[in-house]
Amino acid sequence: MTARTHHVPLRIAVSSGALSPQVAALLSRQRAEEPQTPVVLEEVSVCEQVCGLEDGRYDLGLALTTAPGHSLNAQPLWHDELALAVPIRSPLLNFTAVPLEEFAHYPLIRWRSDEYDPVDQLMERMQQQACTPPEIFCVRTFELMAILVAAGYGIGLGAKSRIAAARELDIIMRPLAGDRQELTTYILRPPCELPPSVDRLAERAQAISG
C-alpha cells in the first residue's frame, strides 16, 4: 500500500475505556520532545475507531481490544486491572481487597463501554458464585459513575489507575480480592506505511510504563 499523507496534527482515536493517566503522560511527553507535531485526541466508540483507522481519518488508536477480524495491527502497551470505586465512608474500606461476596450486597454501577469485556467476565464469575448485586446500573462515562458512587448510589467498577487518580471526586479505589481481572491497552495501527512522526509517537507510548 502507498504511504499515508502526513497529517498535521496527528489524530489519535481513543475508545472510552482506554483513557488513563498513561494517555496524559504520553501527550505531555509528546509536547516536550516534539512540540512541532501537535496531537488531536478524539474519544470515539470502538466501531468508529476501527473504521476511522481503516479509512485514514485517524493515525493511531488506543483501545482495550485488539479489534479482531479487522486489518489493524495491535500491540499491547499498558497493563491495569479492574477495581472498585467506593464512597469515602463505605464499610468496604475496611477491606484492603474486597471479596466478591462482600460488594455483592451493594448496587453496582458499571461503566458500560462496548470494549469493556473484563466487566462482563467478572459479572459471569459473580453469577457462578451466586453473589450477583441486588441492582446493576449501566452508565456511559467514568465521570457519571464517579458522581453516582460519591453520592452513595452504589459502588463502581473501572480501571484501578483511573479510580485512584480521581480521589478529588470523593471516591476511593479498592482492589478486588481473588484472581486479578487484567485490562490491557493496545495501540492500533492502520495497515499502511505511516509517516515518521507517527512512528515516533508510538515509540513514546511504548516507553511509558503502565
Where are the language model's segments positioned?
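Short beta-strand-centered segments that line the small-molecule binding cleft or hinge
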Residues: A25-E33, V40-V86, V149-A151, D170-R174
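Short loop->beta-strand "edge-of-pocket" segments that line small-molecule binding or catalytic clefts
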Residues: I12-A13, L82, V98-V119, Q206
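Secondary-structure junction motif
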Residues: P21-V23, P107-Q129, P195-V198, A202
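N-terminal winged-helix
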Residues: T2-C51, G158, L194-D199
